[in-house]
Each structure stands twice: as structure tokens, then as C-alpha cells.
């Protein structure tokens, strides 16, 4: 039940950007995720250390975390509900015109951000249509005051459109998992 702060790369060489959907609902207790834009697995050259510093400062000094929740709907709509006012809310998106591969080594630093405004008090929402060809990955990032110079940064899970894959997932039989 310890608080969790997951830091994921948008351009990871080993994990797909929307991998959160395979484990997020199973995590118990307080949980936050941040996708670090334009990063590879190492996250070198990003502000990830600042994010850890702000998170650690809040935990050590018993500072209340921002009250928010998020949802990624099947139709691609990403919605953030925030009871505390964020300092900034950004839509991050990247496109690969050829494949569902968002590794930084393939698409470079392709993620761009656009500020989002509330659609009603404390609610931010976005839905991107699938491109005519290729794929688009997108998510919302929220920054909140942390009590130090570096903000607390959290994000939603990443949505990839169109939501299709080249191969179907088949879970291994239970007997294979019992080893």
C-alpha cells in the first residue's frame, strides 16, 4: 500500500507507450504515473530527476499530493478530473506515419506539446482522430506546485490510435505460468 510513482519513457526501446493498460488497474493504493516525453529507456537528458526530487520532497515532508483522476476511454477520449488547480496541463502527441513503433531511435524526439484548457471547472479532455496512415500516440500531462522550484508532474496513460495491432495477444496457458 505504499505510494507509487511510475516513470515511463515515451520512446522506450523495451516497452510500448501504452503498456500501462496491462497493469495499471491491478496496482493498489495511491498511484501516479508520468510519461517522460522525448525520452528513451535511460531517460538521459530529461527532467526525470527533477520529477523524482519533487515527488520525494512531497513524500518526506508529508505534503498532500494533488487530488486528480484520469480515464482513457475505449473511444480514445482522455479525461482528467482535478480537484486541485494544476499550474499547467499539456497534451503531448507523436506520430509515426509507418508503424505502431514509437521508439525514440525510430521516430526521434517527435513528441510535441499543446496547452489544454478546462472544458469545465477541473476537467480537461482530448480525443484525437486516427491519422489517415500510421499511428498517433498521445497523453495528458499535469504539473502541480510542489513546495520547491520543481513542479510535481503526473500524466495519464498513453493512447495510441488507431487502436489496432499487427498481432493478436494470446495469453500463455495456465500450465505454462505455473513453473
Enumerate the predicted regions with their spans:
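Surface beta-strand/loop "capping" patches
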Residues: 47, 53-93, 109-121, 127
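Catalytic histidine neighborhood in serine/cysteine hydrolases
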Residues: 27-43
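Acidic catalytic loop of the alpha/beta-hydrolase fold
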Residues: 11-15, 41-42
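Short beta-strand elements
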Residues: 147-179
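Short, aromatic- and glycine-rich surface loops/edge beta-strands on solvent-exposed regions
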Residues: 132-147
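Beta-strand-rich binding/interaction modules
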Residues: 87-94, 100, 137-140
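Short alpha-helix in the alpha/beta-hydrolase fold that links the catalytic acid
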Residues: 16-24, 94
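Short beta-strand/loop motif that positions the catalytic acidic residue
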Residues: 6-8
Amino acid at each position: 500500500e505504499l505510494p507509487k510513482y511510475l516513470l515511463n519513457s515515451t520512446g522506450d526501446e523495451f516497452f510500448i507507450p501504452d503498456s500501462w493498460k496491462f497493469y495499471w488497474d491491478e496496482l493498489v493504493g495511491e498511484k501516479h504515473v508520468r510519461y517522460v516525453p522525448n525520452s528513451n529507456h535511460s531517460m538521459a537528458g530529461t527532467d526525470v530527476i527533477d520529477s523524482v526530487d519533487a515527488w520525494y520532497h512531497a513524500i518526506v515532508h508529508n505534503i498532500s499530493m494533488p487530488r486528480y483522476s484520469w480515464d482513457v476511454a475505449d473511444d480514445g477520449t482522455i479525461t482528467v478530473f482535478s480537484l486541485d488547480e494544476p499550474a499547467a496541463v499539456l497534451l503531448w502527441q507523436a506520430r509515426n506515419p509507418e508503424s505502431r513503433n514509437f521508439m525514440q531511435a525510430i521516430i526521434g524526439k517527435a513528441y510535441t506539446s499543446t496547452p489544454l484548457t478546462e472544458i469545465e471547472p477541473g476537467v480537461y479532455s482530448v480525443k484525437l482522430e486516427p491519422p489517415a496512415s500510421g499511428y498517433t500516440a498521445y497523453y495528458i500531462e499535469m504539473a502541480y506546485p510542489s513546495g520547491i522550484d520543481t513542479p510535481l508532474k503526473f500524466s495519464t496513460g498513453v493512447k495510441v490510435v488507431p487502436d489496432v495491432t499487427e498481432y493478436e495477444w494470446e495469453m500463455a496457458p495456465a500450465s505454462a505460468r505455473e513453473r
